[in-house]
Structures are given as structure tokens and as C-alpha cells.
């Protein structure tokens, strides 16, 4: 019996031997390693749950109807992370982008070379459309679409300057029946000046008759009266025949400078006349002759 106690005492007192139970030391060691690994791993942030907001769906009078809408938690960086997880060496962009960009680049270089060879044509901007209040009745408002006119004061000044031309004066005095140059046709001349895109000081006698001839093409069915424009411009000699062909060519160029916008609304004509309602030109009304 004493021998067994001596062996036990020897085992417990031996250097380097842990007197604690072996199972406890092994379990504590594993628990320690697991806690260290858990501390090394970064904590994963949980994505915020999608929130719900209230948005205005319909506004009727003084009542407002709200609609519940879910806000998506997807952000741009999520798309960026998704693209980065693709197979290495794979371009997330479309495969034909470089080829299309190359062809687009070549086309752009060719267009720049063609622009250097040909002079640039300055076109007049197209008129914009706005909505204006036409009638207000109680809490209801009636809107009407209205075209914004591009006629500026300098276009009226160019028109008034050309009225002092002696040839134009004789032509207007000759047209007593107002078959070629009534107030609406003359107002269209001002509208064409604003659409052609030329500076006001460049408009000359030929531009006045080109615009007036084109206005007759748009509004008048009788072709004979406007042929008298050639008589006041070139006379009655045979040498005027090539000049008439040149006039028709210039008329087409003038039409193209307006981008083919030769139609003028009645509202715009009245607006042009309202700029200076006391002008003597607006007294050329066919209704007063009958």
C-alpha cells in the first residue's frame, strides 16, 4: 500500500507534468484556439433590410393619395463587387465595344476631315413650344400649347430697311390689288428672315423677292401674278431667261437654309403684325378692297 502512494506522489511531483486532468487541458486548449480564430475573422456586417417609404401617387384637387413603395437596398458598389467576382481575364463590358468604338472613331475622323473641307452651314434654331395658361376658372386651369416665335427686332429692322429700296417701292405701288403682296404675305417675309439664319445686315433686295416668291408658293394657287416679280428684277428682255433660272436656284437654297420650314401659322403672323400695329404695310388688307 505504501508503494502505490509513493508512485502516485512521484508522478504528481515530476517536473513538466500538468497535475490537472488531461481531458480538461485538451478541451481548454481547443476552446482557446477557437476563440482566437473567431477574434481574427472580421465581423460580417448585415445588409440593412429594405425600408418602406410613402410617395405621392396622385394629386387631385386639394386631396393627395399616398402609395407605399419599397426602397431597394441595392447600391452601385454591389454591382461593382459582382463584376469583380467574374472569371479572371473576362471583360464585363460588351464584347463588341472596342470594335464599335474603333469604327465610331474612324467615322469621327472622316467627319472632321469633311468638315474641314466644306464650310459649315449655320441653321436657324427651330422654334420651341411652351404651355401657357389660356383660361383660369375657379380651381381649374386650361392650358394651351403655344409656339415661341424666333422673330427678333433686328428682323423687323431689316424688313423696314428693304422697304426703302426703289425697286421694292415700285413693286408694292404696282400691286394695287394686293394679289402678290398683302399684309399676310409680307409678314411671312419677316418670318422667313428669322428662319434663314442670316445676320440682319446681309438681307438685300434679292432676299426680299425670294421670300415673297416662296410665300406665294405656299399660300396662293394662281401662278401668274408672282411672275411679275421677274419683270421688276430683270426687265422684259430675253437676257433675263438665265437670270430666272438663277433665281429659282437661289429660291431653293433659301428654302434649304430654313430647313424646309416654309409654313407659317396664322398666330405667328398676327404676332409679327402686333410688334408694330401702326405700320403702313399692315393696311394692305384684301378684305378692305371688296
Curated annotation (Swiss-Prot):
User: MF terms per GO, please?
Assistant: protein kinase binding
The record's annotation in InterPro entries points to: Speedy (IPR020984)
**What pairs make up the disulfide bonds?**
none
- Biased composition range(s): Acidic residues: 36-50
Task: Show the segment(s) annotated as Disordered.
Answer: 16-50
* PANTHER family xrefs: WBSCR19-LIKE PROTEIN
What family is reported?
A: Belongs to the Speedy/Ringo family.
Q: What protein is this chain from?
A: Putative speedy protein-like protein 3
Q: Taxonomy-wise, where does this protein's organism fall, top ranks first? A: Eukaryota, Metazoa, Chordata, Craniata, Vertebrata
Amino acid at each position: 500500500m505504501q508503494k502505490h502512494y509513493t508512485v502516485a506522489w512521484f508522478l504528481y511531483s515530476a517536473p513538466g507534468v500538468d497535475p490537472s486532468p488531461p481531458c480538461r487541458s485538451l478541451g481548454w486548449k481547443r476552446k482557446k484556439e477557437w476563440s482566437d480564430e473567431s477574434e481574427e475573422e472580421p465581423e460580417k456586417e448585415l445588409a440593412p433590410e429594405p425600408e418602406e417609404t410613402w410617395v405621392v401617387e396622385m394629386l387631385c384637387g386639394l386631396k393627395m393619395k399616398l402609395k407605399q413603395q419599397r426602397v431597394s437596398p441595392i447600391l452601385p458598389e454591389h454591382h461593382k463587387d459582382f463584376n469583380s467576382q467574374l472569371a479572371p481575364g473576362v471583360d464585363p463590358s460588351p464584347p463588341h465595344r472596342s470594335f464599335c468604338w474603333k469604327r465610331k472613331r474612324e467615322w469621327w475622323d472622316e467627319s472632321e476631315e469633311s468638315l474641314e473641307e466644306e464650310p459649315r452651314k449655320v441653321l436657324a434654331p427651330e422654334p420651341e413650344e411652351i404651355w401657357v395658361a389660356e383660361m383660369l376658372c375657379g380651381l381649374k386651369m386650361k392650358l394651351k400649347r403655344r409656339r415661341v416665335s424666333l422673330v427678333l427686332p433686328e428682323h423687323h429692322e431689316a424688313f423696314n430697311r428693304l422697304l426703302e429700296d426703289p425697286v421694292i417701292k415700285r413693286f408694292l405701288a404696282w400691286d394695287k390689288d394686293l394679289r402678290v403682296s398683302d399684309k399676310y404675305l409680307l409678314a411671312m417675309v419677316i418670318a422667313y428672315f428669322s428662319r434663314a439664319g442670316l445676320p440682319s445686315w446681309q438681307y438685300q433686295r434679292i432676299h426680299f423677292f425670294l421670300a415673297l416668291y416662296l410665300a406665294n408658293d405656299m399660300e396662293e394657287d394662281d401662278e401668274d401674278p408672282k411672275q411679275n416679280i421677274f419683270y421688276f428684277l430683270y426687265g422684259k428682255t430675253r437676257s433675263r431667261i438665265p437670270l430666272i433660272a438663277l433665281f429659282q436656284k437661289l429660291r431653293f437654297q433659301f428654302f434649304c437654309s430654313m430647313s424646309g420650314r416654309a409654313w407659317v401659322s396664322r398666330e405667328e403672323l398676327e404676332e409679327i403684325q402686333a410688334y408694330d400695329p401702326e405700320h403702313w404695310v399692315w393696311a394692305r388688307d384684301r378684305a378692305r378692297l371688296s
